[in-house]
Amino acid sequence: MGLDNPTVVTGQNVQFSYDMASSSKKSRNKKKKSKPSIKEPQSAPLLAVETESVEETHPQAELYDSEADYPSSRVIRRAANGDVIVESLNEAGSGVQAQQAQQQKHSAISSKLVAHWESLSPEEKRKILSISKEEVFSVTKSYQTLHNCNCTVCGRRHVPMEQELESIYNQLYEMARQDNPNSDFVLFHLNLIKELQRGTSSGAEQRTASLQSRGASFLDNMRDEAVKYCISNEGVDRLKEEVLQFKHNKQRQYSEQQRKQQLPPVHTHNSPSDSPSIDELPEREQESLLHTLPDELGPDSSEVNEQLREKYLKFAKTFVSSHPKIAQEYVNRMMMYPDMRALTEDLIKNNGQDFVKAMEAFVSSQQDGPLPGSPEHTKLTAEQFQELQKQLVEKAGLDMSQSPVPTNDDPPQDCTDTDEIDTDLRGRVLLKQFMAGESIINQAFKSLQGSNKNQLKKSVSHSSQGLPEDSEYDEDLNYSDSYDDEDSPYDDDVYDDNDAESYDEDDDSHHKHHHQQHLHHHHREQDAEADDYDSDIDQQERLEEGRGLIQIAITKLLQRKLIVSYQEKQAERNRERLLLELEAEEQQKKEKEEKKLKKKEKEKEKKRQMQLAKEEEKRKQVEEEARLKQEAEAREMQRRENQRKKVEEAKRKKDLEMRKRLEEQRRREEEQERQRRMKEEIKRKRDQERKQREEEQRKRKQEKELKKLQSLEVKKKREEDDKPTEESSQEDNLHKENISHDLLNQLAHPAGGVPYGIVPVKQEMSEEKTVNDDIFNMINEATSKSISTSKSISTSPSHFNALLQKGIPRKSIDTSSIGLNYASAQAALPQPLSFPVDLTEALGFAQKTQVQTSISGPPGLSKNTAASSWDNVPGYVQLSPKSVTQNHSNVQVQTTPHGSVPGQHRASYSTFGASVDPNDTFSGDLTNLTNFLVQTKLEDVSTSAPLHSVSSSTTALPRGETSIYGNNLWNNEQPHIGSLISSHASGPSTQAPLHPRRSIWDNNASVNNYAADLWGNTSSNSTPIAPSTAVASSMVSAHQASATDVIIQAYTLLSTSGGFVPIDVLYQNCLSYLTDKGSFTFGQFVGQLLALRNANECEVLSNDVGMMTHCRFTTPQLQSTLYAPAAAPGGSDLPPRQPSKGLFSDPVSTSTVGLTTIPVLSTSTGSTSSATPTGSIALGQPSSGQSNFFDFNQQLAQPSRANNIWG
């Protein structure tokens, strides 16, 4: 792109003009020194300022010629590389070159704008030409805002001017609408521009006729002509004179009104001495004037003398306007009109004083005749014009000959002598005709050529003070001011805003001066505003002046729109060009990258080929090595395969041999198994044969024993017949012996022939009976002569009813004392006998541990008593655990169909121990039985104190946790022991009173004779409910059962794991549960232990001398004691009975001391009811609704076995 021409300034003003540096990076990074550019041979040395590199912060100036002076007239610009260049200005030929360059530039601009207009589409053209009324007035308002004084007075003056202009616009538009009803704002504006182009203001009739006569394409052609005319600036130049004259007239009107009011001058104009001289005209303005020459100067401009043109330009800058464009326009207009040129010559030579004097003389001569204010009177006829010329010449010559030459300090004469408004109007008309170049002005100039130049210059300077304001309208005429693409690298260098900058500076100075002139008359402006347009200028003149202003505004709007469109189009082209260049640059980069890539690809391909060759060579080597390795591996594999086959063959042979051996071993094992099975079969057969033989032997033994018993019975009968008297003497002793014997024997193994009622109904007699049972059965059969044989054993209840109704139930055991050993229990034993129900679970799972202590005898007994008690019991202390085990095995053979009966009741007590000689005689046995009863003090129990008292209280335990043993003591309907408590329901008795039986040998006594109790004590309120033969056994059994419960409870408290406990400690604990400790002797305690041992429910240990020291109860015994079967449902047919004395002679129903009531746990099995009693049952107190006693009204089913000692 080309470089812009540098801006030229003169004097002390320096203008910097920076050309666009190259966009290349190399030119910015490198340091280059610019060489001096020689425009003319006489140019002065240059001063170059070299910019430092980007890294340096402070640039340094370097002088090429240090001795040369810094030029006063210079041009400063920037070189392509960024260096600042200061050049000396050649005053001689710089203006002509600049003028030519400016003409060429403007010519290029016009041609480009015309080409752009022709390239636009119709829509775009219509868009540019569509100018609204608001846009027109916005131009004038913006001009007033930017270029006029900002004071309040000026602002108020602008409002009526704008209103007047708007009214003029509306009138013109209405006139156009009257001429052409289809006219709009666009067509109206185009017509105004067309009139401006033609230089005439034709009437409405001519415009209407021209529009109708032309074709449809006339509007488009008119648009093109109007736009091209606006581009050429010719119309603007033509209207500028009228606008200047209009403003000048307005200022003169204000001044005349003020003079009428005899006020000091409002505007203080500068004297000619304040203006710069012609010699001091800045050369920058002369150059700038050359830049603003229009394209339509005409052919005369090239022929004008350059020196004369320079002189006129200096004069115009000094007196007309300091703005270069206005001065240039003035010179151009002066060269076009000879009259104006003659006036300028007069002003230059004699300062224009002759012309001013001539005008003053002419005005003064016409004061008597008023000058009409209408525009028609301002037009002179030929005779009037000639007369005016004569008078002006004569007056001017007279005044110049008589008046001296005025100094520069004298005020202008036209400002002081002209007082009347009509004179002013005439002067303005004449000045207007002079500016139009009429003949009267030419003659005046010719007559004044020889006058004083200084006076003329002074007059012209005063007259032209208002001219700088006229230049304000030319700001927007230069269409190059609003377009500046200096920074763009794609600028076409069409426009130059340096002229606009200098023009703005001059405008600022002028506005400042204009504002100072109005500082003194702000208070006067308000009175003058009412008379703005009250002059004699008629409506037509105002319309013409307004038309010119509107035409200028429309022209500027069209120029702006066209320039904006051109700029947009150019910007779009620049963007496209930028995109194209960017694409080209990117393409170049891509090409470079592709070249580099191709080069790299070639290098890579070459390297790859070399690598492939190396790899191929290496691969061949590897393949050769692999082939050799494979051959070696194949040979090795072949060798291993042969070796594997050999090993497999050897292994196969070995497996075959092993299989044969295993097969042989299996056959041997099968043979052994067959032989073993044969042996087992033989052994089983032998066992069966042995069992058969044993069964036969047992049967033979039973037959033998039966025969022996029969022989004994026969012998006993024979002895009874032989000794009737002896039997009567020993009746009482034998009665006691039988009771003691039955007490120990019937608790475990009741006799089969006696209707106890406590053996289960369906229970058969055990096959393995002891010898003692047989002996006692024989004795019972011998003594029971009067008992009927019709009583049945299976359905009769127990004959211990008298004892059962006062029997002592089991006592609960306190769970808090389970974990205590016997030593702690002995130290602190509970006084009241009250134990919870759940002790059974703890005792049933307790481990057995032996706790043995060596105590010589029970505490509280003398050694003699203990020794005698043990010594007087034959056959007991010699027992050993072996015998106990033997007896236990014998007892276990007995089974019940509905469950097991507790051990203390199903065991058979043997009075004679385990080793009883079957060959003993009956008399010996009877003697032993008597001695045992005597030693155990049962012979005098009628007078002894009871063991303990039984409490009848029923409030100790809840009702739901109690139970009874059952209907009877050994009821066949219960799986366990029946309740020791009578639970039959009370009812009316239907039986006759029974007589007590006095002796067990009394066979003549009736079976219905019952004793009140075991010892024959009767009571008035006692009702016997059992025969006397059965009372003794029942009472003994109840006594034994209650004592057994006390012993078991004491043992449970001492041993929680089922181990051995010293009997002396156990006896002391038993006494702690009794209220009357003297009723339960140590001999009775030992007897209970022996009875339990014979029933295999207790184990005892003896010392070296055969005395028992320790005992232990088995777990089944503990469980059977704590768990009792439920009472069988059903009522009893027995009548209600009175409370009677029990075994220990205490009234059961009225006793309040002794043991507390305890619950009895029960389970229902078999055919018994599952209902559990819910009430707490007191000891010795039966519950209502049930009965545990035998119904004595029943007949015995086996009369043959009813003949025993119990009847």
Curated annotation (Swiss-Prot):
**Where would you say this protein principally sits, based on its record?**
cytoplasm
One Pfam match, given by its short name, reads NST1
Question: Which named protein is this?
Answer: Stress response protein NST1
Q: Which portions of this protein are annotated as coiled-coil regions?
A: 564-727
Where is there biased composition of kind Polar residues?
7-16
- From the Swiss-Prot or TrEMBL record, state where the protein is found: Cytoplasm
* Keyword Coiled coil set for record: yes
- What is any one of the record's Gene Ontology cellular component terms? P-body
Q: Which family does it belong to?
A: Belongs to the NST1 family.
Bias type Basic residues, positions: 25-36, 511-523
Recall the taxonomic lineage recorded for the source organism: Eukaryota, Fungi, Dikarya, Ascomycota, Saccharomycotina
GO biological process terms on file? negative regulation of translation; response to salt stress
Q: Among its keywords, does the record have Transmembrane helix?
A: no
State the organism of origin.
Eremothecium gossypii (strain ATCC 10895 / CBS 109.51 / FGSC 9923 / NRRL Y-1056) (Yeast)
Q: Where is the composition biased (Low complexity)?
A: 252-262, 1163-1176
Note down the stretches annotated as region Disordered: 1-58, 248-284, 398-420, 451-535, 586-735, 1124-1148, 1163-1183
Please indicate which superkingdom the organism of origin belongs to: Eukaryota
| Keywords linked to the UniProt accession | Coiled coil, Cytoplasm, Stress response
Compositionally biased residues, Basic and acidic residues: 586-721
Q: Where is the composition biased (Acidic residues)?
A: 469-507
Query: What does this chain do?
Result: May act as a negative regulator of salt tolerance.
- Alphabetized InterPro entries for the sequence: NST1 (IPR025279)
